[in-house]
Curated annotation (Swiss-Prot):
<protein>
    <recommendedName>
        <fullName>Guanylate kinase</fullName>
        <ecNumber>2.7.4.8</ecNumber>
    </recommendedName>
</protein>
<dbReference type="Pfam" id="PF00625">
    <property type="entry name" value="Guanylate_kin"/>
</dbReference>
<keyword id="KW-0547">Nucleotide-binding</keyword>
<dbReference type="GO" id="GO:0004385">
    <property type="term" value="F:guanylate kinase activity"/>
</dbReference>
<comment type="similarity">
    <text>Belongs to the guanylate kinase family.</text>
</comment>
<feature type="domain" description="Guanylate kinase-like">
    <location>
        <begin position="18"/>
        <end position="196"/>
    </location>
</feature>
<dbReference type="GO" id="GO:0005829">
    <property type="term" value="C:cytosol"/>
</dbReference>
<dbReference type="GO" id="GO:0005524">
    <property type="term" value="F:ATP binding"/>
</dbReference>
<dbReference type="InterPro" id="IPR008144">
    <property type="entry name" value="Guanylate_kin-like_dom"/>
</dbReference>
<keyword id="KW-0418">Kinase</keyword>
<keyword id="KW-0963">Cytoplasm</keyword>
<dbReference type="InterPro" id="IPR020590">
    <property type="entry name" value="Guanylate_kinase_CS"/>
</dbReference>
<keyword id="KW-0067">ATP-binding</keyword>
<dbReference type="InterPro" id="IPR008145">
    <property type="entry name" value="GK/Ca_channel_bsu"/>
</dbReference>
<dbReference type="InterPro" id="IPR027417">
    <property type="entry name" value="P-loop_NTPase"/>
</dbReference>
<keyword id="KW-0808">Transferase</keyword>
<comment type="function">
    <text>Essential for recycling GMP and indirectly, cGMP.</text>
</comment>
Amino acid sequence: MKNKVRVPFSPDHPLCAPKLFTISAPAGAGKTTLVRMLAREFPDSFQKTLSLTTRAPRPEEIPGVDYQFVSQEEFQRRLDNEDFLEWVALFGEYYGTSRLGIDEIWKSGRHAVAVIDVEGALVLQSKIPTVAIFISAPSQEELERRLKQRGSEQDTQRQERLQHSLIEQAAADKFEYVIINDDLEKSYEVLKSIFIAEEHRNVL
């Protein structure tokens, strides 16, 4: 068993304040898996925001845990009510981050972690302070292999995602941290170290 050295997060301490972490990556780079690992180790320190989307759940996804899956009509209703801090249309589907969801996580004394696309992360950066993390596959070839292995897209959809990944990769320099996910365990250790360091950064 590994020894863990970590100073407990104390949200009531005057130097501590809950933060918003954004984690973005091309489809297939491994962001969802890494965030699940983080959630298992630090359940009391942070909570993943529940993004809304109009797309269908993938086989491994759990409604109400990975996303809140809604109809086009429900998404439009939320949009009309200005419920979203950011929203995007991607591959014919809609994705949005609820401002109320982030506020509720902060009120609980935990950090909020938004697993969102690059465009959404950049919008959030322009509105509120964030800790922006970009996760990349080691190569386009590896990204394509992972998408094929995932098997949740048709060939046309997969090619669209691969083309879009080039645009996302070009925006990596707009993020504070970049993790090349060529080894899941090592990448998780890097992500964890970022989380712990930022958790105790003096923001005053």
